[in-house]
């Protein structure tokens, strides 16, 4: 994706291909290296011991793991002279996140296409596959003979991530069911994040400040 943009020439940029080994089993590490070789990518792999660090965390170890991984990626990217990190979240991830927030979090929020780091000044996180559907990525993977890893964490079977993954899969099945009667259901969910009418909300939060409906109503 980013190589295509670079070849297009309208966006001037340089690329570094970075992957972290947080404590993978040798077979999983080899799979990443094989994928990079198939695509002829000059992949820079750096090692951490994140899996070992979160092994004893009983409550929400996946949240801690994700935070630590993000921090290590920012630090390593800065060493390479980068100011942005591109992650692989796609269209389906966005709509599943919206639905998980509604059904399991009691909140309405989406996954933004880019973020400025609050802990690493000058660094941004971008999601270039934001509009790309998962089925298209799967076809691309199969066309190129690649094999993808999921979490690959040795502790997944005993932690809350297993429940989270089942919830995400539940949302995936729900969307598939909805598309049987409304083929554009996924697009409508995605577009809902573009069409938020805050005046109709009972309460909303922006930049850490909450705005209850009654307070806004009395101001009118």
Residue ranges and their predicted role:
Residues 1-100, 104-108, 112, 135-143, ...:
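ATP-dependent adenylation/nucleotidyltransferase module used to activate substrates
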């Amino acid at each position: 994706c980013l190589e295509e943009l670079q070849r297009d020439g309208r966006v001037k940029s340089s690329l570094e291909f970075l992957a972290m080994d947080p404590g993978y089993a040798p077979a999983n590490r080899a799979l990443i290296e094989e994928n990079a070789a198939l695509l002829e990518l000059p992949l820079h792999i750096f090692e951490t011991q994140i899996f070992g660090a979160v092994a004893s965390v009983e409550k929400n170890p996946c949240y801690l793991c994700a935070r630590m991984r993000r921090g290590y990626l920012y630090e390593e990217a800065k060493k390479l002279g980068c100011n942005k990190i591109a992650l692989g979240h796609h269209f389906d991830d966005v709509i599943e996140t919206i639905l998980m927030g509604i059904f399991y979090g009691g909140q309405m929020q989406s996954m933004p296409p880019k973020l400025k780091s609050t802990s690493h000044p000058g660094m941004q996180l971008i999601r270039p596959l934001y509009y790309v559907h998962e089925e298209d990525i799967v076809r691309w993977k199969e066309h190129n003979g690649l094999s993808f890893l999921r979490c690959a964490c040795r502790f997944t079977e005993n932690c809350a991530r297993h429940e989270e993954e089942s919830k995400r899969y539940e949302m995936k099945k729900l969307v598939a069911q909805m598309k049987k009667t409304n083929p554009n259901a996924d697009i409508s969910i995605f577009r809902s994040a573009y069409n938020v009418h805050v005046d109709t909300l009972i309460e909303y939060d922006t930049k850490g400040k909450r705005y209850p409906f009654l307070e806004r109503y009395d101001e009118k």
